[in-house]
């Protein structure tokens, strides 16, 4: 299912971008003349020619210095997001025992976070083709990311409030939602030439267009779904009072905090852009670039740094990295322990029996490694 969606996605990109190139080639002369007329306005007065430079309609919303500041922010947040997402992805492939229903969803969430952070990097704005590619990549993978968080919330709700615990058959519906809806939004926005420069990156350029709503309205809906689900779960587990329930309560709170931190600045910025499109706020764009690409790292902290993954990594390092060191260390500890017991029980046992027991401990230790 995933391979079919991704191949369809790539095919549409190639076809549509190619058709755009053909149309742009036919209109080169017209566009060049229009650009020259917009760029230069000549006014002749008393044999004096005054040349006035006008702004290009494709200019960014901020100054060059502000764009450079936004680039520095996104380099930091995207790098952290990539590292966090890769941690979960590598852990998923490394430990077969950890591939449960929950970790599979977290894996696909991290996959979306990884590519979203990559597409946020400012390497795609030098040409129309690259700008369209960045816009499509961000729409597709950011939408997929927040839809996967919704699926995780739905799964938690089913576990806490119903008797349905076997959810593997739901995966086909989750894949359809989390890949199909973003694919439709990304392609329809490309067909109608909705992508352009906004802030310091390429996205759906018109903040009041229907295509922006196709992206942000589902995000707002998902935000409130997650909020309601997590409040309901906290209420449910608050009916019980023990250390395990308190721990679950803290974890659920972290889920909501991580999602809110990564998505709330984006929602606020989109509302401001929609209500006042001619007055973009640099601080809101900066907060969006700081936190939204960081989602892979935040999800790593919430979902990846858990007892299961940590135990798997401890076993992995003991088995493959520190095998010799750990084995020798354990041997020395056993020898010291046996020496102590031999000194204490020397009068009640002979040397041969003592050393036989020590050898047996070392052999057993080798068998456990």
From Swiss-Prot:
What subcellular compartments does it reside in?
Membrane
What's the short name of a Pfam family annotated to this entry?
A: Dicty_CAR
Q: What is its main location?
A: membrane
Q: Does the keyword Transmembrane apply?
A: yes
Which SUPFAM superfamilies does the record match to this protein? Answer: Family A G protein-coupled receptor-like
Q: Name one GO molecular function term.
A: cAMP receptor activity
Q: Which residues lie on this side of the membrane: Cytoplasmic?
A: 23-72, 122-146, 195-212, 269-369
Q: Which family does it belong to?
A: Belongs to the G-protein coupled receptor 5 family.
What's its job? Receptor for cAMP which may play a role in prestalk cell differentiation. May act as a negative regulator of cell growth.
UniProt name for this protein: Cyclic AMP receptor-like protein A
What organism is the protein native to? Dictyostelium discoideum
Q: Kindly list the organism's lineage.
A: Eukaryota, Amoebozoa, Evosea, Eumycetozoa, Dictyostelia
Gene from which the chain derives: crlA
